[in-house]
Every structure is written in C-alpha cells, then in structure tokens.
Amino acid sequence: MSAIITIALSKGRILDDTLPLLAAADIEPEDDIKKSRKLIFSTNQPNVRLVVLRATDVPTYVQHGVADLGVAGKDVLMEHGYDGLYEPLDLKIATCRLMTAAMKGAAPKSGRIKVATKFVNIAKRYYAGKGIQADIIKLYGGMELAPLMGLADEIVDIVDTGNTLVANGLEPREKICDISSRLIANSASMKMKHASLQPILDKLAQAVGAE
C-alpha cells in the first residue's frame, strides 16, 4: 500500500494558481476547494490529500512533517527559514517582487532608520548586509500607511504593479529579490517516502515546463 502523501496549499492567489498545476500532475480535489469551508480534502488519488492553510503556516506544517509537500511563496520561505525543508521546484506562479519603498522624492536618511514590514527577518538581514542601522517595526498589513504617519522612513513589502504605492505617495526604491511560489518538501519525507513523492515532483516539473 502506498504511503499517504499530504500536500499543504496556501490560501488565496497562490491556491488559484496551484490547482491547475496539480491537475496537470493528475491530482484533483474531490470537493471544490474554493467554495468549501473544509480545510482537508481527499483527492482522486487515494493516497494523496490536500490541506489548505494560511500561507505563513505552510512551511511550519512541512517542517514538522505533518505535511510532506507544500506550496509557499519565496518571501514566506525566506522569512521562515529552511530548517528541515527541501525546495525542489520553482513553480513560477504568483510572481512579484520584494522591495523597499519610501515617500516619493524623499532623500535617503542618513544614520539609523526606521523600517516597517511584516518580513522582519528578511529586513534585518537586508539592511545589515548593506551596513545600515535599522530599527525594524513589525506590522501585519497596510505598510503604506507607516511612512505617511511618520511611523517609519521606509517599508519592505511585496510589490506587484506598484499602483498601491503610487496611490499613497510612495515609490519603490530597491529590489531585495524576485518572488514566486515554490514547492517545498519535508527533508525526512523525501527519504522515507521517496518512491511516492518523486512521481509527483516529476509531473509537477513537467507541468511547470509546459506552461
């Protein structure tokens, strides 16, 4: 009997982009994930089930082996860290950029600066790497408001079109990295369940390459 494989999926935009890739890999939920209030879904493959989580929780579930595979944004993975995780595939979906931003036309501030972000670990590493002393302020959303209200000199946030920044009088400054969603695997699962996981990885790789 094949080992049960649990795949953790991120809610929202990433989920919408992930389902067609799973379908191309012959994995389809038996219920409509987008409409159902359930969080655990059986699939057309008797040994594969899907769980739908907050994006920031996906690496934790995979890291602890509760899920064997997961789909999460590179930003979430960089913030969480890779302990116990293996990243076999860039799914090339939900693409965007992680950038710094500040008030439009504002001169770069010398000395210690204040930075608002939900990506605290990434921001600490980024500014330290540039030799800039930065006080990092943790926020959970609405980053654009921080410079407007004088809470922060800069923000670190995900930028797609940049329209929200412009609408609030901000401008992007420096790109930290390009972001896309990645397939991650529990390191122990890759060894213990290799025979069951590798065919899924191969089919997903083919699906990504065919896009």
From Swiss-Prot:
This protein's record includes keyword Transport: no
This enzyme's EC code(s): 2.4.2.17
Subcellular location: Cytoplasm
GO biological process, one term: L-histidine biosynthetic process
Domains: entry comment: Lacks the C-terminal regulatory region which is replaced by HisZ.
HAMAP family: HisG_Short (MF_01018)
Annotated protein name in UniProt: ATP phosphoribosyltransferase
Organism of derivation: Hahella chejuensis (strain KCTC 2396)
